[in-house]
Amino acid sequence: MSFTAMLFSCSNNTQEVRDFLASKNLPIGIAKNALHVYKDSGRISSKLITPLLHDFSNRKQHPYNEFPMGVKIINFEGKDSVTITGNYAISYSKTSVSEISGNVVVLNHTEQSKLETERLFWDQNTQYFFSEKAFTLSTVKDTVYGIGFECKEDLSMHLAKKTVGNLITSEK
């Protein structure tokens, strides 16, 4: 009877591994069917749901998270509940700007308004959306079509560019 033991040791430190993965443009982490809950002062402020997350936080200059199979974000900030969905997203950590593309839909459940576009940029610091792509903004009263827009996260205070459609307005 013979017995053989082989022992191996790794001497890489965590930073060396991170640098290696970054140099090969590989994520430091991959999560499948991820649910991330964000809390502020013990209160849930938003949820992020995605079938696949690539974590590139190992990048020194521009760390980011990529959602190649789409993303659903439910935001409970303020008085309105807003849901954002898209087929692809990338979120940059340092700037807090996200790009969401492919069948992007933003729903304000409280006001019953909906924004649809193919590409949307979201500045999470200023809580602002903007795009230069074609869009449809539907409210209870009217629907506006156009190319290019800016608006707050809750779809209020919007600036629509190159628009067509009927708008109901009131003087104040």
What are the functions of these language-model segments?
Residues M1-K172:
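Mature-chain termini and adjacent capping regions
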